[in-house]
Structure formats: C-alpha cells, structure tokens
Amino acid sequence: MKMSVNNILQDKRRWTTFQLIAFRISFVFFIIISIPNNPLWYKHVFAIDWLNLDYRDLYDICRFGSGVNWFGRTTFGHHLQGYSIWVNTLFFSVAAGVLWTAFLKLRKRERYEYDKLFYWLNVIVRYRAGLGIIGFGFTKLFPVQMPYPSLGILDTDYGDLTAQKIFWLSFGIVPWYQVFAGILEVGAGTLLFFRKTVPIGAALLVGALGAIVVVNFAYDGGVHVYSSYFVLLSLFLLIPYYRPFYDLFVREIPAKVSLYLPEFNPAFHYFSVGLKAAALFIFVGVFSYLQYIDFRYDPYKQPSSAGVQELRGQYNVTEFKLNGETRPFNPYDTIRWQSATFEKWSTLTFRINKPLRLDLSNGGGDPKRDVNRTFELSGVAGGQRAFHYYADTDNQMLYLEDKYKLFPDPRNVTAGEGGDRGVRNYLTDRTLNDESPAISLEEWMPDSVRHKFADEVNDVHPKARTTRRIREFAKADELAKKETRKRFVVNYAVYDNGNKVILRGVDENRDSLYVVLDRVVKDYKLAPGKLVAGQYD
C-alpha cells in the first residue's frame, strides 16, 4: 500500500453534498467529545504541582468527561447503558450541522471541500485518543488496575464473587498478561502521535478496545462506555484508509492512500515538532516513571500501609465469645466469625453467615486514604467484611473501621471531587437511623492515641509523598469526621510463634469480643509471581 501526501491546491476535488453535511455534523460531534466538559478539569490542570507530580495528576489530564451533558445524563428518560450523552451529543451535532448548512446557503457561501478543517479535526482526535489510551494503558503496563487477589478474596467461595470481580481477578492472577495489554495500549497511543503510523495505532485500538467492550458487557465490567470511546475515535481516524484497506486485503490489488497536508512555514513546523516532543516526554517518559512509583510504593487499589508482620495470614476461628457467651462453630450463625485473614497491608477480613450490602464498584477511583481503597471488598458477597486498622504495636492494640461505605466514591472524576475528597459516606436525612455507629469517632480512638497516627499522610515511601497526596489527606481528614462507619477496638496477643492469635476487645455494637484464631496454611494452585505491586516488608 502506497501513501501519498497532497499539499494545498494539489489534487483538489469537490466533495458531494452528503460529504459536506456529514463532515459538518462530524466536526461538531468529535470536537465536543474530544474536549473536557467539566470546568473542574481546567481547575485541576492549573492546580497541578509540576515539581512534585503524582501519576494521577497526568492520568486526570488524559481521562475526562466529554459530550453534551446540558440536558442531563438520560435520553428521553433512558440511560441507554451509559451511552445517552453520546446520543444527546449526536442530536446536538445534527442540529448544528443542519444550521451550519442552512447558514451557508442563505449567505450563498457554499464550500466545495473541507480538506484543511478535516486535517485539523484529525489532529485533535489523534491526540485525544493517543493521550487517553496512554493514561489507560499505563495502569496495565505496571499492573495495578487488576490486582492479584488478596487473602480474603482467595478465602471467598467462587459463587460469592460477582461476574465483574471474576473477570478482573482472571486478569489479576496473570500480571504479565496485563503488562502485554498495557504495552499494546501505550504503544498504540504513541503511534497516533505520528501521521504515518496512525492506521496501525488506530487499527490496534479498534481490535484491543473492541474486545474490552464486549467483555465488559458480558461481565458487567462497567468500563464499556470508555472503551467504546476509543473504538469510536479510532474508527473515525481510519476513514481515509477504508477504501485502500479494502483494495489491498479484499480485492488484492495495489492501493494508494492520499492524505491532505497543509504547507506550514518553518517556524510553525519547528513549534509543532517541539510540542509533540514535549507531549511524548511528559505523557510517555515522565508518566511511565510516575506509574512505576505508584506500582512500587502506592498502588491505587491497595492500601499503602504495611500490616502487622506477625499477624499476616489466614486463620480458622476456633473460639468465639460475645459478652462472655461462647458461640460454638455453626455455619448458620449470623454473628460468629467463620474465618479471618490479616492481609500484608493494614486490613482484617472475616466472614459471617449474614447477607450484607454489596459494593458493586470495581474498587477503583483515586482515594489516597487506605480505608477508602476497597478492591478486597468490592464485588465480594458471602458475608465478607473488611476492616482497615491502625496498629498501636507498643500496646498491641488494633483500631478498626469498616471499609464498606453506603455511598461508594464517584469513579473517574477530577481530582478533588472523587476518591477521598468526594466522600459522601455521611449521615443524611435519607440514611436509616439503625446505620448509625454505636461507637463514635472520639470514643473509638481517643486523643491520647490519635497522635500516633496523625502522620498517616507520610506513611508511604518518600517518592510517593506527592503534593496531591498531601492535599487529598488534608481535606479527607476533615471529611472523615462526618463519615458513618462501623468501628471497633481489640487487643491482640500472638502465641506459638504466630500460629495462634487472640483478640480481646469491644465490637461495633459495644459487645465484648473474644476471638481465638489458629493459623491455617491453604494450598492454592496459584501463587503470586515476582511482579507484585506495593512494598510491605
């Protein structure tokens, strides 16, 4: 297949009326879906500390909401599986295209072609698709998007996992496959920066992201709209290549691609080359380093704080007392713990035979506080509970708070509006009274102890102490005072070289609690490899 570039005034051809109207509609549509529709995005860009970047700073530049949302997020009352904003944008674009055509006819200023405008529209779509998929791909290239299953998840029956969770865990157990997918996405995005490699990059995105769309529909994955977004942009970029591809691969005859390229003066040419080089340096070079730091020290779906070393592992609950009353093992007991796990990070999970509200998120978003990172809880049923804990190792005390939230954090929103700073887990007029915690925040952790954990923002490797993390914690600490969480406190004692753990304390209902845990070693047929996120030793 041969590619030729036509300069201004060369090989000018007259577009058909259909092509002119279709372009006007397409121009409005793709411009709208290629630029941020939320003022908070622009506020975020100007607030970035470029001397102390967090990976999420660049990620939020690459990922943003777009489209016409002035009429809400429904079309005639229907969400359309999340595509309603696209449909509303299309309606708006059709109306704008018709008005554009009518205006030109009234002014008798008919155009015969839009070669130059089509060129610049392609540039905008190329860079939008390229930057977006690079941000998306780095979370796979350094595998943090789909973590390896935690001990609590491994202790969960297969039937108690949602379809989405099963799919994500299927990726999580093969991190090198995630890496391959990340290389594909980042590589395809990089190819879109260069005009001659656009068809390769766009074709790769159609194939890779098209498969992700199908899988997300099959497993209720939740990112089908965003994946479809890149498929749509890539299909648009391939428009000049459809006929040549057909000639080459179907008719098996020589094919020629004719692309329009305006003539630029030398100054503009050097400026554009410099701009492209800067974009590649920041969004490929710097971004890859920042994503590695996140993978190595602060994976965004896993807590960053290390758990108590001597507690880590899986346990059978051999003795359980509530208010001094022994509750023998009974699989139908709705109060007694059935099993328990201490993760390598600061999370305790245990199972009870009681239906609980299910967290249907994918555990993502951008929270910096460990208690708001819920991947080990999201999509997990079977009475599984997960508690983040603060460990006072001097006095062997654990201060635990429930990781489940009535209102999950909004996903994929601009910094400061989601994750920790957008916590909506507050008491409201609509919140049921019986959801109020029996132990208040002040009772749970008195001031005499709280000062030991006041420096939580720095409880991470120095390279991960970004300005964004500091800002998020500053606001999150204030909002945490309004949260509605179940909390309890226990003293822990370790015996028999760590094979037995005894917990004594008060649970979230102010009942005295006494639990004896015996360590158990389970022979799973899979084991984590060397490519493991986080640093917990």
Whereabouts are the PLM-identified features?
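Hydrophobic alpha-helical segments
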Residues: 36, 147-251
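Extracytosolic and intramembrane catalytic regions of membrane-associated proteins
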Residues: 310-537
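Interfacial segments of alpha-helical transmembrane regions
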Residues: 111-136
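Hydrophobic alpha-helical transmembrane segments in integral membrane proteins
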Residues: 139, 284-312
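Individual transmembrane alpha-helix segments
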Residues: 70-92, 174-183
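Alpha-helical transmembrane segments of multi-pass membrane proteins
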Residues: 30-46, 56-60
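Internal/C-terminal transmembrane anchor helices
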Residues: 127, 131, 263-297
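Cytosolic-side transmembrane helix boundary signature
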Residues: 106-107, 111, 239-279
